[in-house]
Swiss-Prot record:
It catalyses: a 2'-deoxyribonucleoside 5'-diphosphate + [thioredoxin]-disulfide + H2O = a ribonucleoside 5'-diphosphate + [thioredoxin]-dithiol. The lineage of its organism: Bacteria, Pseudomonadati, Chlamydiota, Chlamydiia, Chlamydiales. Tetramer of two alpha and two beta subunits. Transmembrane segments: none annotated. This is Ribonucleoside-diphosphate reductase subunit beta. Its EC number is 1.17.4.1. The active site is at residue 129. Its cofactor is Fe cation.
Length: 346
């Protein structure tokens, strides 16, 4: 096929020249040829998980919430959980759009980031839907990060990892800048989505396991399914940047990352104590000390760092829940079937 060569200097993309960051040799607008098959697989898996909160019936949750069958301590856990997640998902989405996307120079990785940003919006929608369904004070829930010290501390911690990256003069071309960018990725993928969120999932899914607040529980299952992919993408992205830029992975940077995770563990334990001043549903705040440390070790190992806590997992059932390859179909209880563009009725 004949082609009009508009610019003789521009050539078709060579896969070997693609890079995750600082790649100016290829056109970032050309998806193919795909180099990072893991990024494309994460994108496809994300697309296979399409869902909306409004597809989940909330009648049983509404009935239970309006009754006197839930204790005040159980209500406290639910409200503080919603209070954290309702704005945390927005922080993650904003970080993708404003801090991460522009520094990633690979189109298939960007393709997934666009998908993830959409999912974060769906998750934020979820917490609004829950508030509206239960008749909660939306201002109280969505402003909890300004009113609850344990939530504010976690969000402030996350924002410290975004400030430098949002500076208009920030660049990942230097080792210092790239190291700061990696810390941002660790902060949001490893810590926020891989530690803070998982602790929250345990709390709400514990209700679901006892047939309480099942509508909320089902939505959290969907979110967990999304977040598992987010976490895996983030780990692959961090490891990919390390592999392509080995000079940035210094002992100093590794120590800084370990210190960040240690601080995150402390913050999450304090949050768990705030949520659970007394035990409910077989949960005690002391169990979250072990759990948060356990998953922190797993996250450290996934990015090539040594575990530091060696704690047991007090919630082994979460391993099954997190397994994306399990036979259970999370979407079998949906009110409506998801329709792709190809079969919508006009």
């Amino acid at each position: 096929m004949e082609a009009d060569i508009l610019d003789g200097k521009l050539k078709r993309v060579e896969v070997s020249k693609k890079g995750l960051v600082n790649c100016n040799q290829v056109d970032v607008n050309q998806l193919v040829p795909i180099k990072y098959k893991w990024a494309w697989e994460h994108y496809l898996n994300g697309c296979a998980n399409n869902w909306l909160p409004t597809e989940v019936p909330m009648a049983r949750d509404i009935e239970l919430w309006k009754s006197d069958e839930l204790s005040e301590d159980e209500r406290r856990v639910i409200l503080l959980n919603l209070g954290f997640f309702s704005t945390a998902e927005s922080l993650v989405g904003n970080n993708i759009v404003l801090a991460i996307f522009k520094h990633i120079t690979n189109p298939e990785a960007r393709q997934y980031l666009l998908r993830q940003a959409f999912e974060e919006a769906v998750h934020t929608h979820t917490f609004l839907y829950i508030c509206e369904s239960l008749g909660l004070d939306e201002g109280e829930v969505f402003n909890a990060y300004n009113e609850r010290a344990s939530i504010r501390a976690k969000d402030d911690f996350q924002m410290t990892l975004t400030v430098d990256v949002l500076d208009p003069n920030f660049s990942v071309q230097s080792s210092e800048g790239l190291g700061q960018f990696i810390k941002n990725l660790v902060g949001y993928y490893i810590i926020m989505e891989g530690i803070f969120f998982y602790s929250g999932f345990v709390m709400i899914l514990s209700f679901h396991r006892q047939n309480k607040m099942t509508g909320i529980g089902e939505q959290y299952q969907y979110i967990l399914r999304d977040e598992t992919i987010h976490l895996n993408f983030g780990i692959d992205l961090i490891n990919g940047i390390k592999e392509e830029n080995p000079e940035v992975w210094t002992t100093e940077l590794q120590e800084e990352i370990v210190a960040l995770i240690e601080k995150a563990v402390e913050l999450e334990i304090e949050y768990a104590k705030d949520c659970l001043p007394r035990g409910i549903l077989g949960l005690r705040s002391s169990m979250f000390i072990d759990y948060v440390r356990h998953i922190a070790d797993r996250r450290l190992e996934r990015i090539g760092l040594k575990p530091i806590y060696h704690s047991r997992n007090p919630f082994p059932w979460m391993s099954e829940t997190m397994d994306l390859n399990k036979e259970k179909n999370f979407f079998e209880t949906r009110v409506t079937e998801y329709q792709t563009a190809g079969n919508l009725s006009w």
